[in-house]
Structures are given as structure tokens and as C-alpha cells.
Amino acid sequence: MKVIDQFKNKKVLVLGLAKSGESAARLLDKLGAIVTVNDGKPFEDNPAAQSLLEEGIKVITGGHPLELLDEEFALMVKNPGIPYNNPMIEKALAKGIPVLTEVELAYLISEAPIIGITGSNGKTTTTTMIGEVLTAAGQHGLLSGNIGYPASQVAQIASDKDTLVMELSSFQLMGVQEFHPEIAVITNLMPTHIDYHGSFSEYVAAKWNIQNKMTAADFLVLNFNQDLAKDLTSKTEATVVPFSTLEKVDGAYLEDGQLYFRGEVVMAANEIGVPGSHNVENALATIAVAKLRGVDNQTIKETLSAFGGVKHRLQFVDDIKGVKFYNDSKSTNILATQKALSGFDNSKVVLIAGGLDRGNEFDELVPDITGLKKMVILGQSAERVKRAADKAGVAYVEATDIADATRKAYELATQGDVVLLSPANASWDMYANFEVRGDLFIDTVAELKE
């Protein structure tokens, strides 16, 4: 990693632990900063805080005392999940203290070039596809960021022979200043996380931060299926490389069942190793990045053909007596579930849906769920999802939790059917995150098979 001295002997407050906060605290300590960590979880239930204290880092747990900011901190590094209306963050900003996320730290120390991937849906799959293609081509794509490996941790071990392939959320991108990827991808932009950002325009602005420092020597890969992406083209200094499944573009595109890059066939769409029209878009974005990095068509084709998907994103779990189970717990919004359903014959799908109630109506989902065999509905949003099912003419049953939903879905399915967990909602009404929800689905499927 690059050894930088801009944090040496500076007082830095790390707000919120989890993986990214813990990684940031250790990195800042290594760089000579005077680090204080503040986390809401009580110390006795906080292994990360206990570990950091043993390493000599100051920790304050069990709450977020505003008087802590009476100290003269030069910087705050916040956990990306903490909203900007948090009183600690509001006070820090009012005092003129810069508030960053650990993605910025990763950029500052990274010896490796960075490819950043953001968007409303498809981030994880596209990030993984890009990482696997680059690694197959000898460019060693190191996955990091929102995909589960803290960027600041991976950046410490990356050399200039590697490529940091970062999945970036809007939460993370709100906290960057100098962050400068060589290639950035925006998979798509849909109204999500409005409860965090306040409006769709603020959400788009957060995503757009990915390209703030890019120049004409850098490449911004955009989804030209969306008029919004086309409109944004004039608002960047970067060289835009489009991808589309709807039209021929000066980039990656679908035509007559083939995936092209600038007029050259790379592979057939039906050779992609994972189903669904959304994965064609993900593959096109990957092809654009790979070709910009000089990867040959055969390597791209072989890697994407063998691609097995990502856990919790249309993940094939098992087959029990001819009933296939797919875990799409990462589908936390309507668009993601629409795209998941596009890969299946509705008449053979039992869909498990529902979760955190964010006030959404699900009318947009009605055309996509019409013709489903059955639905199993759960969670805070159940009444709203049931209204959509009624409009679509789909019969449903209710469930108390994911385990109950999985069992009921299996009872409703017959040989040749698919049980699809694709909730179209966040998990936080019942579960800590979509991973926990998906893992419970996987565990229940395993129990059903016994």
C-alpha cells in the first residue's frame, strides 16, 4: 500500500464499526492517526470494539454522546449505513469536520488501479463477473467494497499488478472527495433508498459522485437502456462507453441473440452461465470493462459461460423431487424482482415476497407477477403486496417468517416448479440484512431435503 502521512498525528473519529469501521480504524492507526472509535453497541456485546481496545485504540461504546465532538477532530470516518441526519454527523458537519467513508481511505492508499461499480441493481453480479474475467486474463481482480470485503482492508494488500474491483453503494459514495477510479460502471438508476437520501435526485447525485474526479482519460460505462443515463452523458468529463440490450451503441450491445463490442461478436447471450435478461445487461457491462482492459474475446466467453452467479442473487440452492429453489434475497426492490422473474416461466413459479414496509405500493409489479402459480407473502409490507397479488389475480398464502414461507412454498409446488425467494423488499423488519434472510432460506431448503 502507499504510505501516506496526511493522517499522521491527526485526531480521527470512526463512527460505527461493522466490517468497514473496524477496517478503517486499524488502517488509520497504522497510518499514525490518533483514533477514537464510537459504536452504539454495548462493549460487552461488541467483539470488534474489544479487539480494537486490546490493540490500543480508544473505544467509546453503548451510545453516541454528542459531547464527544467537543474534542477537535480533524476527520470523521463513518459507517456508510449511518444516515447524514444522525446528530453526530450533523454536529461534525456544522463544525466543519470532513465526513468520509472508508472507500476514500482505500483510494488514498491503493497502489492498484480501481474499477468502481455502482447502480441500483446488478452491482454484486457485475462486480463479481468483472473480477473473474480480469483474473482469468491475468489481471488479478480483487473484489472489495459493498460486496463484503472492506475496501480499505483489501487496498492494503493490493499491488500495482492487481486491480481493485469495488462494489460501491450510494451510502459509500456520499463520503468520497478525491476518489478516482480509472473505469466506473453505473449498472442502472432506479428509485431506491429514498428513505435514506430523501429524494430520487439526491440518490442519483450520490451515485454520480463515482465520476466526480474522472477525466477524459477515464471510462464511464453507462446503461443506455435508460434515458436518464443518456441525459447524464453530457454531465461528465469521462469518456462514456455505453451498453444496451435495446439498440446498437458505440460500446457493448445485444443484437440477434449475440453480444457485441463495437461491431465484434464476443459471445451468444444464451451462453451466459446465469439466467435472466438482467444478467445479459450485467454481462454487457462486464464485456465493456474487459475490452477496455484489453481482455480477449475467448477469455471473456469462457469466464461468463462458466459463471455460476452470486450468493443471494438468483442463487440456485437445490432441487428437491423436481422442485428447484432459488435464493434471490438480495432483491430488495421492485426492479430486482421484476428482473428475477424475467428468467422463469411464471406458471411454474411460487414466489416468496414481502419485507420492510417503506410505503411502496406494488402496482409496478402487477404485470410481472400475473400468471404466477402462487405467492407466499410475509413481512410488514404484506398488505401492500397482497393488494398487488389481488390485482394480478394470483392466489397467495401468508407466512410468519422465511422458514415458514419456504415450507409453505414447497407444499404449493409440484415437480417442474420453481420456488423463488425474491422479496422486492428490504429485510430489516425481521432480519439484520438480506444475507441472514437468504441463509435462513438455504437452511430451510436443506431441512426439507432431509
From Swiss-Prot:
Belongs to the MurCDEF family. This is UDP-N-acetylmuramoylalanine--D-glutamate ligase. ATP binds at G119, S120, N121, G122, K123, T124, T125. SUPFAM superfamilies: MurCD N-terminal domain, MurD-like peptide ligases, catalytic domain, MurD-like peptide ligases, peptide-binding domain. It comes from Streptococcus pneumoniae (strain 70585). GO terms for biological process: cell division; cell wall organization; peptidoglycan biosynthetic process; regulation of cell shape. It is found in: Cytoplasm. Pathway: Cell wall biogenesis; peptidoglycan biosynthesis. Signal peptide: none annotated. GO terms for cellular component: cytoplasm. GO terms for molecular function: ATP binding; UDP-N-acetylmuramoylalanine-D-glutamate ligase activity. It is an enzyme of class 6 (ligase). It catalyses: UDP-N-acetyl-alpha-D-muramoyl-L-alanine + D-glutamate + ATP = UDP-N-acetyl-alpha-D-muramoyl-L-alanyl-D-glutamate + ADP + phosphate + H(+). PANTHER family: UDP-N-ACETYLMURAMOYLALANINE--D-GLUTAMATE LIGASE. Its EC number is 6.3.2.9. InterPro entries: Mur-like_cat_sf, Mur_ligase_C, Mur_ligase_C_dom_sf, Mur_ligase_cen, MurD. Keywords: ATP-binding, Cell cycle, Cell division, Cell shape, Cell wall biogenesis/degradation, Cytoplasm, Ligase, Nucleotide-binding, Peptidoglycan synthesis. Cell wall formation. Catalyzes the addition of glutamate to the nucleotide precursor UDP-N-acetylmuramoyl-L-alanine (UMA). It comes from the Bacteria.
